[in-house]
């Protein structure tokens, strides 16, 4: 254990989960001395729930984290034992990379990467309090042994540990997750800041012994033959690849669950927190979708050398004996042994409207929050917030400009804006449908959107910079060659490409945007591109496919950026004549940072925005005269 009675760092990150590790790495990459404080060193990078990374919307976040040199994507590629590109039959904008991960490899590789990161120390201990310079300025942390660590900024990533309570049937026990104690004293300290707090819940299914599953009678789901990896630096899979199994609940399963609903912690009245809408418990599915006779279950091995299987789709808070009964009513699981019961966990969260776009608390300077404490669910959402908080905490220490991600340049920006503008009434999960500019926010172009920003911030390694420059040079050369020649309809027809014989000349990029035209189809017309590597061909094809749509979208993006330029001072008064009391209250609670953010508050009207704009312009003119 790294331990000193008194020490000083630039940034301290509390918690070694997905938000904490990403925050610590981001801060350290910025060149500031960073400490990652966690209960146990070997708990860094633990996958508390499902053994998977990515998915629809989530995969976009992982790619964006990687584009800024974050660690989640690289570690997921090392630990991935099955890779699948979701929505493969749809357009690239909504396709989502996903990987089944080996829990053990993921944890070991995340710990290895964290130990190897320069400017970063790992400290074991429980944080019980903050060091305060004033009632509204954090200056470090206090551990349970009363040792102190001073810091310019603190990033809190407590996950489900704040006043965490585990529920199995009518039995409840304190815990941050199964086998770990909760954080009680720190939760009490947060209450003293008079922050808007609430309770949320999440759940996990029983873990099964794969040796007791009848795999032979189940459908098999293999991974993709040509895996789509997360990191722009990865080239191949590292771990052995496996298949998952598929089974379904049935009427007997549903009958067992219905007969025991009152024994469920959720339906028995033991849980007050709201659970995730898009990851409901099996009890919730049976009640909400009463007309369905079966629900799909994915049997996901937790590792290549681990017999544990994660049955994705049957999370529960029913008593353990009922769990065994309903599991064994399912085809292929008739003799399955339950290694660990499923459970629900309830925990404190902070209303994210109390945060700024940097994820620093509005009313407590130097304290940043990231992950489930902000009302989100999912490893990827947590890691993306950790990245934002870590970068901004380091920038605060370096006295650099705040780092704000916009809705027009990243899913990270969409998520942060959603959280701090509208708050949450249930655990927030990322989907591609949340992004209005999703045609340009594709998983495949995350590096083109964000890696240059990483250059400017100083959080990108030379290896990544060199690889990105090489890739962009190749893309630029290829596009230049394709646009250098105008082709007649006759030339295209002679090359086997069907187009309207309208006399209009088109360049190679225009032709690539046609349906069913592949890069190989235009090579007879551009023989100098025959040696273009596959990844560059695919990227240029995707870029050409969306070029016209994105050009039309630019007007909307320009309008959004114009409104984002109207910054709202922290002490701005909403006592504006003509502004309704309801909107005043919502604006006071959310305290938007720009006119664009104010426009997205529920109930906002064009007339109210015009009143605010007039007041902001008047304020700006007054400041100009004063100076």
Curated annotation (Swiss-Prot):
The keyword Cytoplasm applies. One of its GO terms (cellular component) is cytosol. SUPFAM superfamilies: FAD/NAD(P)-binding domain. It comes from the Bacteria. Keywords: Cytoplasm, FAD, Flavoprotein, NAD, tRNA processing. NAD(+) binds at residues 275-289. GO terms for molecular function: flavin adenine dinucleotide binding. Its main location: cytoplasm. One of its GO terms (biological process) is tRNA wobble uridine modification. It is found in: Cytoplasm. Its cofactor is FAD. It holds the Pfam family GIDA_C_1st. NAD-binding protein involved in the addition of a carboxymethylaminomethyl (cmnm) group at the wobble position (U34) of certain tRNAs, forming tRNA-cmnm(5)s(2)U34. Homodimer. Heterotetramer of two MnmE and two MnmG subunits. This is tRNA uridine 5-carboxymethylaminomethyl modification enzyme MnmG. It comes from Ruegeria sp. (strain TM1040) (Silicibacter sp.). The lineage of its organism: Bacteria, Pseudomonadati, Pseudomonadota, Alphaproteobacteria, Rhodobacterales.
């Amino acid at each position: 254990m790294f331990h000193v009675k008194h020490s000083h760092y630039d940034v301290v990150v509390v918690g070694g989960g997905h938000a904490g590790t990403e925050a610590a790495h981001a801060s350290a990459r910025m060149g500031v001395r960073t400490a990652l404080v966690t209960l146990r060193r070997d708990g860094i990078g633990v996958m508390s729930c499902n053994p998977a990374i990515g998915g629809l919307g989530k995969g976009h976040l992982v790619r964006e984290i990687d584009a800024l040199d974050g660690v989640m994507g690289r570690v997921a590629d090392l630990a991935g034992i099955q890779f699948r590109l979701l929505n493969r039959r749809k357009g690239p904008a909504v396709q989502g990379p996903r990987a089944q991960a080996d829990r053990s490899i993921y944890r070991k590789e995340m710990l290895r990467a964290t130990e190897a990161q320069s400017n970063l120390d790992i400290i074991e201990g429980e944080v019980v309090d903050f060091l305060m310079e004033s009632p509204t300025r954090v200056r470090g942390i206090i551990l349970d042994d009363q040792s102190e660590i001073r810091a310019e900024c603190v990033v809190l990533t407590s996950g489900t540990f704040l006043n965490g309570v585990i529920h199995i049937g009518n039995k409840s026990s304190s815990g941050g997750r199964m086998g770990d104690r909760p954080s009680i004293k720190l939760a009490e300290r947060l209450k003293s800041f008079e922050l808007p707090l609430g309770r949320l819940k999440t759940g996990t299914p029983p873990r099964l012994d794969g040796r007791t599953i009848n795999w032979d009678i189940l459908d098999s789901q293999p991974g993709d033959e040509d895996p789509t990896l997360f990191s722009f630096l990865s080239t191949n899979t590292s771990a052995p690849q496996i298949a998952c199994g598929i089974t379904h609940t049935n009427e007997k399963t549903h009958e067992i669950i219905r007969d025991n609903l009152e024994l469920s912690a959720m339906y028995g009245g033991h849980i007050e927190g709201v659970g995730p809408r898009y990851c409901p418990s099996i009890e919730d599915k049976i009640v909400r979708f009463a007309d369905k006779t079966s629900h799909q279950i994915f049997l996901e091995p937790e590792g290549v050398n681990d017999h544990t299987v994660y049955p994705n789709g049957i999370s529960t808070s029913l008593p353990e004996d009922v769990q065994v009964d309903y599991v064994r009513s399912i085809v292929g699981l008739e003799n399955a042994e339950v290694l660990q019961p499923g459970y629900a966990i309830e925990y404190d969260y902070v209303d994210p409207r109390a945060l700024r776009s940097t994820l620093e608390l509005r009313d407590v300077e130097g304290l940043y929050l990231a992950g489930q404490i902000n009302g989100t669910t999912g490893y990827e959402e947590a890691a993306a917030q950790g990245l934002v908080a870590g970068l901004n905490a380091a920038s605060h220490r370096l006295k650099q400009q705040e780092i704000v991600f916009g809705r027009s340049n990243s899913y990270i920006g969409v998520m942060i804006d959603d959280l701090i503008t509208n708050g949450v009434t249930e655990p927030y999960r990322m989907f591609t449908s949340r992004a209005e500019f999703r045609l340009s926010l594709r998983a495949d172009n995350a590096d083109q959107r964000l890696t240059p920003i990483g250059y400017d911030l100083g959080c990108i390694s030379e290896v990544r910079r060199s690889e990105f420059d090489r890739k962009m040079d190749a893309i630029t050369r290829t596009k230049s060659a394709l646009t250098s020649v105008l082709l007649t309809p006759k030339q295209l027809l002679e090359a086997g490409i069907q187009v309207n014989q309208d006399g209009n000349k088109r360049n190679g990029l225009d032709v690539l945007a046609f349906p069913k035209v592949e890069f190989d189809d235009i090579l007879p017309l551009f023989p100098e591109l025959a040696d273009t590597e596959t990844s560059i061909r695919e990227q240029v094809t995707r870029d050409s496919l969306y070029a016209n749509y994105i050009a039309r979208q630019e007007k909307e993006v320009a309008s959004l950026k114009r409104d984002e330029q109207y910054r709202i001072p922290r002490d701005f008064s909403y006592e504006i004549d003509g502004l309704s009391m309801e909107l005043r209250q919502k604006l006071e609670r959310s305290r938007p940072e720009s006119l664009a953010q104010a426009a997205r508050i529920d109930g906002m009207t064009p007339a109210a925005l015009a009143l605010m704009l007039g007041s902001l312009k008047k304020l700006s003119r007054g400041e100009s005269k004063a100076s």
